[in-house]
């Protein structure tokens, strides 16, 4: 199966370098209805208000999850569904899964590929033409690495306030790349070697700055948690001997990391070394569920106002788990605020961050997704989207709604608190070989699907864990294996 799909994927990806105006080839037109629902009026919902990390680009444009609290939320409007314009744009081979925007409105991304090393790109947000590239160092992946579940080497990166890309490489370095004001060049500004604290088969999953300017980083294998001082180049680290396959979350005075076993709060010790300030084991079935990278939580932790942080565990059925972020609890408080089961047993898993809107969390079901090389790559996934709210006293939670109709295989969805809509990317049940993908909007208030519109069919329109993004003008963007798809109101 793998050998059969490799040429297919390569054919889907290989397009001319200057391909901004060309649509993605749609090899299997859909047989299902291409537009359902109708435009809605905006319904403002309460918003989480993450602080601005001074070391990162302005919220919500600094990383795949928008801000250092990883809320996946926008305070401005995305499409409402009026005269929707859905387009596709072919690009040079790579998947630009993390989309950020620089101070001049250009798309900035780091794009892993199966046919070349990761490539940093500047992309025109209007034409989707690639304006500049930088080929990043590459290295052979450790044995046993699943090609399309490997987020090292740029899958996670962040953009700072000076329009600089900070990205880990597959060679276990941290590169700092300057994007020119006109977007026409990318130049290397710094290169930090982190191999002194990493073993040969360890790769950096993610690197992020704390509010004081230190750069934290984590490795998947072995669970190394490290700190780099960019000024002195001093590196300190500890090893958890667990797996860390997600990115992490940064608050003003702490860093929150979830491993395949536990939820952690970290601080900085007197020696400058990472120190565990609290940790909590979560429920775990021990099963690597279909769509998951390992037998553990699939979420990057998400903080919301009031001192709460959420993940999903790996129980069956899966729970939304909410913790208190505080280092020390007040009298009568418990570390775990709630554990709320969502989606049916044997059919619940997520490999994406939870969305936050004040005291509401929104969670997507990815159970059953197989990467493009998987034996069931053409099959639809299990349905499910849910909302869980923290009560006003902060002492418990409840499930507000579940939508068991939408099937979102792997996208990082987003919520607009200005429209009250959740934006996701779904697959419809259709005849085998059809594989239609849709832009889909849900009501954050009720969970009902309000509209959806056809994006394209087949492998070129598979987003494979890429994150949806809303541009400054409200246009929705999503990387797919064939390039990028966009959606906006007419």
Q: Positions of the model-derived regions?
A:
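Sequence/structural signature of beta-propeller modules
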Residues: 20-139, 162-164, 489-490
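Loop/turn-rich, solvent-exposed surfaces of beta-rich toroidal or solenoidal domains
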Residues: 111, 308-312, 351-459
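Beta-propeller blade signature
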Residues: 124, 180, 228-229, 265-267, ...
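Asp-box/WD-like beta-propeller blade repeats and closely related beta-sheet repeat scaffolds
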Residues: 135-154, 158-159, 168-212, 219-223, ...
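Blade-level signature of beta-propeller repeat domains, shared across WD40, Kelch, NHL, RCC1
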Residues: 462-490
